[in-house]
Every structure is written in structure tokens, then in C-alpha cells.
Design a protein with these regions (language model features):
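Generic solvent-exposed, charged/amphipathic alpha-helical segments
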Residues: 22, 26, 84, 88, ...
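A general structural motif at alpha-helix termini
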Residues: 24-25, 105, 187, 212
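Active-site loop/short helix in cyclic nucleotide turnover domains
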Residues: 7
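Active-site catalytic microenvironments for nucleophilic, acid-base chemistry
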Residues: 27-32, 67, 193-196
Length: 212
């Protein structure tokens, strides 16, 4: 029921689920950072594993920094549209070389070599795990993520859909700085923020942060 409510909200307001998730994450980060308004999250748009794959079939970037400055007075729905508008502007430049974007971020924020400015990364996979072939339709499927221990990002969240229409949240994180409890807190508050926001989209981000 909860997932259906999120999807219905996106459909009714012409929003993508990615942007709703980004809003949930950035609001949580703002809450735990004394109301910080300037939040940046890396959003994956084309997953490619190796450097060679970065430029195969073109040089479409694998991810982009989703930076938004949202004041506490901004209502939930307007904040979601701010993220969506920013993302639409970025998508026009999705053919940028990934290395160029990383270099630009390094110059802008003076980050040391082999480090990054952003600590949170998001991938949303809208495809459900379901077999369309009638001959195979009775075969049940189950997929599960397993970390290989090489967490190159401080916190990397992959959100996908299950066969029954639910959503699966897979967290990969660097254990030197984070632990499972941190992921539980992120999930708990992100869900409270999102469900409060879709129930009362006219409520301000500041009010939502106080209530949750």
C-alpha cells in the first residue's frame, strides 16, 4: 500500500520516483546537518562499471551531482519540482565526459585526489523483476544484492522494484565511517519524510523535518 501511494503521488503530480527519493534523502541530510539548505547527492543515470564502458556507445555520463538549495519555507511539492527542474536541465548535458565532471567537481570543491565532495549516491531501477514469457511465468524469481566488500562510495543506495510491486532498498556503505544503524536511521526518516510529504504536500520542508 505504501509503495502504491508513492507511485500514485508521482503519477498525479507528474514526478519521477527518482526525484521523490532524492527529496527524501536530501531532507534527511538537511535535518541531521542543522537545517543545511545546500545539499548535493550524486544521482546515477547510466550504470557503467569500467572506464572503457564509460565511453562505449557514446560518452553519456554515469552520474551527475544533484545540487539543490531548498529553504525550510518551501512546501514539499514545490521542493520536488525544484529537484525535477534541476534534473531536467542537467539531462540536456548528459553526454558530458564523466571524467570532465569529476575534474570540475574536484576544482570547485578543492577535494583531495581520489576523494569526492558528495557522500550519498542514488540509483533507481524502475524495472520490476517479472517474467513476461508465458512459458516461464510459473517460475518464481528471487534476486538479492550482495556487497563484494569494495565500497567505493561512502553511502550508495540502490532502489529497485520487487515482483509483487514492492520496493527494495539496498545500501552499500564504507564501514570505516558508517554502520548498519546509520542505514536504518536513513531509511526510517526517509520513509517518514516521504509519507508525510505526500499526505500533506503543502506542508513546508521545515515543518516536516520538525515533525519527523
Amino acid at each position: 500500500q505504501g509503495v502504491e501511494n508513492l507511485i500514485d503521488f508521482c503519477m498525479n503530480h507528474q514526478l519521477s520516483m527518482t526525484n521523490l527519493l532524492l527529496l527524501g534523502i536530501r531532507t534527511y541530510l538537511s535535518k541531521v546537518n542543522n537545517g543545511q539548505e545546500d545539499i548535493t547527492i550524486q544521482n546515477f543515470i547510466s550504470r557503467r562499471s569500467t572506464h572503457d564502458e564509460w565511453t562505449s556507445g557514446g560518452s553519456r555520463t554515469i552520474m551527475f551531482p544533484c545540487r539543490t538549495v531548498i529553504t525550510p519555507e518551501t512546501d514539499f511539492l514545490s521542493a520536488a519540482y525544484e529537484i525535477q527542474n534541476m534534473q531536467n536541465r542537467i539531462y540536456m548535458h548528459s553526454n558530458y565526459d564523466p571524467a570532465f565532471i569529476m575534474d570540475e567537481m574536484r576544482k570547485r570543491y578543492n577535494t583531495p585526489e581520489h576523494t569526492g565532495y558528495e557522500s550519498c549516491y542514488l540509483t533507481y531501477q524502475p524495472m520490476t523483476v517479472k517474467v513476461e514469457n508465458e512459458m516461464l511465468g510459473t517460475i518464481r524469481q528471487h534476486a538479492k544484492w550482495f556487497a563484494n566488500g569494495a565500497a567505493t562510495k561512502k553511502m550508495y543506495l540502490t532502489v529497485s522494484h520487487t515482483e509483487d510491486g514492492g520496493m527494495n532498498f539496498s545500501y552499500h556503505y564504507q564501514t570505516a565511517h558508517l554502520e548498519e544503524h546509520d542505514m536504518e536511521l536513513l531509511y526510517y526518516y526517509m520513509m517518514r519524510i516521504l509519507f508525510k510529504g505526500i499526505a500533506e504536500p503543502d506542508m513546508s520542508i521545515g515543518e516536516i523535518m520538525e515533525l519527523v
